[in-house]
Amino acid sequence: MTPGELLTDGADLVINSGRRTLTLVVENASDRPIQVGSHYHFAETNAGLSFDRAAARGMRLNIASGTAVRFEPGQQRTIELVDLAGDRQVWGFRGLVQGRL
């Protein structure tokens, strides 16, 4: 077994069940690849990504923990976001919130 490995019965795993989700179109308008991790506050991602940041406030990518999505230069893709849970406080990242949402 590899550290962090999950052994399942093979059935589909459901993540973030019951949480509000949002689908957005995101474009990498920069000249460099941009990668965003699973728990990064999406509204605070690299300024080279073009999307509705106000709509993404308080949300993260709806992907498995520890994974990421990569946006190549000029690439446009549709992503799904999910509400942050817990205390709904955001600290760090680009410093745009620094507290309660």
From Swiss-Prot:
It is found in: Cytoplasm. Keywords: Cytoplasm, Hydrolase. GO terms for cellular component: urease complex. Pfam families: Urease_beta. Its main location: cytoplasm. InterPro entries: Urease_beta-like, Urease_betasu_sf, Urease_subunit. Belongs to the urease beta subunit family. NCBIfam families: PRK13203.1, urease_beta. This is Urease subunit beta. The lineage of its organism: Bacteria, Pseudomonadati, Pseudomonadota, Betaproteobacteria, Burkholderiales.
